[in-house]
């Protein structure tokens, strides 16, 4: 990880007096969970702490009635981050650091929410497969256009599905079944959370919500 909690915390201590209250609280909370994540050796727990850190920065309720990647507020947040990312941290994350892990994640039905709706009898097999094909097509379009915010929204919707499996008891702790997904998601989220916090700190006068 290029930038860690200590680096960001030291900077925050120097700058926080100049942060608007809303930004200051988001950064403070996100850093506290990033710190906890970096201390955690267990991958499942580290993953959960990293998601909390990201959610602390986002600081907006996620409506489970609609797919995360389709939520207007969430997409606007990612687009704002991309527009303010003058050193291309998000682009580097998606296109240089983890392109293979991201492609594997996008092709994995077990981190696609409609698959689990099918398992619970809420969707038919044809419905979930149609949704999965449509989602892969959307992801491929984002890949072809190198549309970083759109691709991140789709990737994070998959990561959110994995988060839900763990938090709601739908997966076994330390399960061999999801080790690859957990490992990749921990790596991606570790880089993403630090990038998001840094971009927000770079733009204290931006309205963050």
Residue ranges of predicted features:
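Short amphipathic alpha-helical segments and their helix-coil junctions
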Residues: 24-41, 138-142
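Short, hydrophobic/amphipathic alpha-helical patches that form generic packing surfaces
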Residues: 32-36, 48-59, 158
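Short, solvent-exposed positions on alpha-helices
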Residues: 44-48, 176
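Polyanionic, low-complexity intrinsically disordered segments
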Residues: 3-13, 17, 21, 118-209
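Short, surface-exposed loop/turn segments at secondary-structure junctions
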Residues: 40, 65-68, 173-179
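Helix-boundary capping/turn motifs
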Residues: 21-30, 43-44, 158-162
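Helix-loop junctions and short alpha-helical segments
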Residues: 2-22, 50-142
């Amino acid at each position: 990880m290029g930038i860690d909690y200590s680096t960001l915390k030291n900077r925050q201590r120097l700058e926080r007096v100049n942060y608007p209250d809303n930004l200051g609280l988001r950064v403070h909370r996100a850093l506290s969970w990033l710190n906890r994540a970096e201390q955690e050796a267990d991958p499942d727990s580290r993953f959960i702490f990293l998601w909390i850190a990201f959610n602390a920065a986002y600081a907006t309720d996620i409506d489970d009635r609609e797919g995360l990647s389709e939520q207007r507020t969430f997409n606007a947040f990612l687009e704002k981050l991309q527009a303010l990312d003058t050193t291309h941290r998000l682009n580097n994350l998606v296109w240089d650091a983890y392109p293979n892990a991201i492609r594997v994640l996008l092709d994995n039905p077990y981190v696609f929410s409609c698959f689990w709706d099918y398992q619970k009898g809420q969707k038919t097999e044809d419905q979930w497969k149609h949704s999965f094909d449509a989602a892969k097509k959307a992801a491929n379009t984002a890949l072809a256009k190198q549309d970083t915010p759109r691709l991140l929204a789709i990737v994070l919707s998959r990561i959110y599905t994995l988060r839900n499996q763990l938090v709601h008891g739908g997966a076994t702790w330390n399960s061999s079944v999801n080790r690859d997904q957990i490992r990749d998601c921990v790596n991606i989220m570790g880089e993403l959370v630090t990038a998001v916090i840094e971009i927000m700190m770079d733009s204290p006068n931006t309205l963050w919500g």
